[in-house]
Amino acid sequence: MGDFSNKRVVISGASRGIGLAIAKRLAAEGASIAILAKTAEPHPKLSGTVYTAAEEIVQAGGQALPLITDIRSDDQVQAAVAETVQAFGGIDICINNASAISLTPTAQTEMRRFDLMFGVNVRGTFMLSRECLPHLLEADNPHILNISPPLDMQQKWFAPNVAYTMSKFGMSQCVLGMAGELADKGVAVNALWPHSVIATAAISNVLAGEAALAYCRSPQIMADAAAAILAKDSREFSGNFCIDDVLLAQEGVTDFSVYRMDPEKPLWSDFFVPEDTPEIEPLLAVGNPAP
């Protein structure tokens, strides 16, 4: 799909899950990866730290720079970007993957949770993109990729968890605005979102339980889709809100069974996927058991 040798990547929140899968996918093709994440010590429910992620990236074939970073902190983000440039000599790709989630209605959303989601999802995305931008402008094929949904402004996405939806759509609004702003500068800005729920520790340990993983795809589908986007010409592919399997089908992928956690179970559709999205495989609404 692409050659990422000599590509220098900054990715937030890549100590586990989708972010780590993307980092390892790019590392397998020779990329140097700076991992910006808070987890220095193992979490009681969520496996992986910035240091274990770095080990996996090196094992995959890339270089790794683990950087303990609170994406909400101006000083820490600025320092992390500076360390990346010092270590790698520049930045070609910025991936805004870090995300905070609270699937709660208005009355049950504490303001500290609201501030966390907006601090990580919106402010963190904007700030990391902003700090990387001077270096991206010097790169040959610069990309910003946000792990955020299409801007499908439907009440059904907002009503159950207003604050979370606002924050994720805020990440997508960064794509809409920055893609337009940077179009004449050759910096691509795109979004990538999963069609089905992805099997991560957050799903099994925090949101839906271990049994839910059977209805998911593995993070590898997001990693492969991200690689496909980041291999494209930044001057020709920007401002797109991509769905993982739809994009891969356009790239010629035909066998999606390799991504299923359990081939016997149907897949759950993820939040925020527009109704008119082509179904590459049949999907059920989240939480619906197999028929």
What are these regions (language model features)?
Residues 8, 15-16:
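Conserved glycine-rich cofactor-binding loop
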Residues 105-106, 110-115:
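Substrate-binding pocket helix/loop in short-chain dehydrogenase/reductase
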Residues 191-192, 211-291:
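C-terminal helical subdomain
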Residues 7, 62-63, 90-91, 136-150, ...:
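Active-site loop of short-chain dehydrogenase/reductase
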Residues 29-52:
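Conserved glycine-rich Rossmann-like NAD(P)H-binding loop of the short-chain dehydrogenase/reductase
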Residues 129-130, 176:
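A short, exposed helix-loop element centered on a Lys and neighboring polar residues
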Residues 137, 143-184, 195-198:
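Catalytic loop of short-chain dehydrogenase/reductase
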